[in-house]
Regions:
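Carbohydrate-recognition beta-sandwich/jelly-roll modules
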Residues: 1-182, 227-229
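Well-ordered alpha-helical segments within folded domains of soluble proteins
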Residues: 88, 139-159, 204-223, 271-290, ...
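Long, well-ordered core segments of solenoidal/helical folds
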Residues: 108-140, 167-189, 229-255, 296-322, ...
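Carbohydrate-binding/catalytic loop surfaces
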Residues: 122-142, 186-208, 251-275, 318-346, ...
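Extracytoplasmic/secreted proteins, especially bacterial periplasmic and envelope-associated proteins
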Residues: 148-151, 165-172, 214-217, 230, ...
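Acidic/His-rich structured neighborhood in mature extracellular/periplasmic domains
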Residues: 183-238, 245
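Flexible, surface-exposed loop/gating regions in the mature catalytic domains
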Residues: 218-232, 244, 248-257, 261-284
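Active-site/pore-lining binding-face segments in mid-to-C-terminal subdomains
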Residues: 268-331
Length: 386
């Protein structure tokens, strides 16, 4: 006796039924036995290994779960996958626990499906893979690349207080992502980018400051919840790399601030731009890391980056009150800011700094006010409201 939980794609919701003879095609199936023993199963998916570390996903080859009642009253649980062609891999996950999931809350099975059901992302055996943009090399309808910003882990972190399975998934996934850290200390975006290649001579395996900053914040959040030591080496290696890039590649501002370019590559030809969302999020992550690790050097670097935002201040504001997206090393501003992402980054940075009476708060408040006016005039939603 027991219960099977599965995600019904056609209904867009979870279903449960008594454990017996059954066939299930779902990104995640949870089997709960009457004894309390639970199986968390991410069913097999098939990928072809493509150039530059990319994957091509074959949805028509998704695996299934088969449950069969036995004569002795037991149940056989079988995961079926497809035979593999040369150059292909398949992966699946099975977690077991002596207790059931809490279906009254937004548990980790629900979180997993959130990131898989629309086809935009997959957790694979070796990392978090997002759909490749059309200007990545290679790209295609079902092409994916390993993204440092593993947003599914954020979902598990947010459920740690109420889901017993969350800590295991956090540890497993963050440890897996740490294996992607290269000899320099960052997690590379392995595909090429036509845009970065054309504008800056930046090839495959480039450093994206935003993606790596978001991953750093995940390590910081996990360390706060799980205790120091588990991921400290990974964080310190990355922070040493970031500090070196900041020291050698920064663009100085009027009173000594440092703008940090959005991208880096050991073979880059031209220094890239700095976007406000990257700069603000990196600044906040450095403050968080400084607090966690008791590092004055990181706080000093964050202060320099914050000073760069103050120095450039009103230069970010467009005539229509929107913000420019980025600034080039020659001081030219470039349009194309996100609808609300940059506002939220400024909001989070200001919130962190608000406990102290710092003069920089005035600039952050001004930039947020201008962006807010533009968002309200154009009907943008999704921004933080404090």
């Amino acid at each position: 006796a027991g219960t099977v939980w599965y995600y019904d794609k056609s209904a867009g919701d979870w279903r449960s039924q008594a454990l017996g003879d059954g066939l299930y095609a779902s990104p995640v199936v949870v089997v709960e036995l009457a004894s309390g023993q639970t199986y968390f199963l991410a069913l097999p998916r098939t990928f072809a290994l493509r150039e530059n570390g990319s994957r091509e996903y074959f949805p028509e080859q998704d695996g299934i779960l088969r449950t069969t009642k036995l004569r002795d009253g037991g149940v056989r649980i079988t995961m079926d996958g497809y035979g593999l062609a040369p150059g292909c891999v398949t992966d699946a996950l099975v977690l077991t626990a002596p207790f059931g999931l809490d279906w009254s809350v937004d548990n980790c099975a629900k979180a997993w499906v959130t990131y898989v059901k629309n086809g935009d992302s997959h957790w694979c055996f070796d990392g978090y893979f997002r759909k490749s943009p059309s200007n990545y090399i290679p790209s295609g309808e079902n092409y994916y690349y390993c993204c440092a910003a593993s947003y599914c882990i954020r979902g598990y972190l947010g459920r740690m207080s109420r889901c017993k399975e969350a800590p295991a998934l956090v540890i497993l996934s963050l440890d897996t992502m740490s294996q992607w850290q290269n000899q320099y200390g960052y997690v590379p975006t392995t595909p090429g980018s036509e845009w970065l290649q054309g504008d800056y001579g930046i090839g495959p395996g480039f450093y994206d400051t935003r993606f790596n900053t978001d991953l750093l914040e995940l390590y910081i959040s996990a360390t706060r919840r799980l205790g120091k030591g588990m991921f400290e080496e990974t964080m310190n290696r990355y922070l040493a790399f970031f500090s070196q890039v900041a020291d050698t590649s920064h663009i100085p501002t009027e009173t000594g601030g440092w703008l940090i370019p959005d991208y880096w590559h050991p073979d880059e030809i031209t220094a890239p731009h700095t976007s406000l969302n990257h700069q603000a999020s990196e600044c906040l992550a450095l403050y968080h890391a400084a607090d966690l690790l008791n590092r004055r050097d990181l706080r000093a670097l964050a202060d320099r980056m914050l000073l760069a935002i103050v120095d450039t201040g009103s230069g970010w504001v467009m005539p229509n009150h929107n913000l420019y997206y980025s600034i080039k090393p020659d001081g030219t501003y470039v349009e194309g800011d996100y609808p609300y992402l940059t506002y939220n980054d400024l909001y989070d940075l200001r919130k962190y700094l608000s406990s102290s009476e710092r003069s920089e708060l005035e600039t952050l408040t001004y930039l947020m006010g201008e962006k807010l006016q533009w968002m309200q005039n154009t009907g943008v939603t999704g921004y933080e409201k404090g």
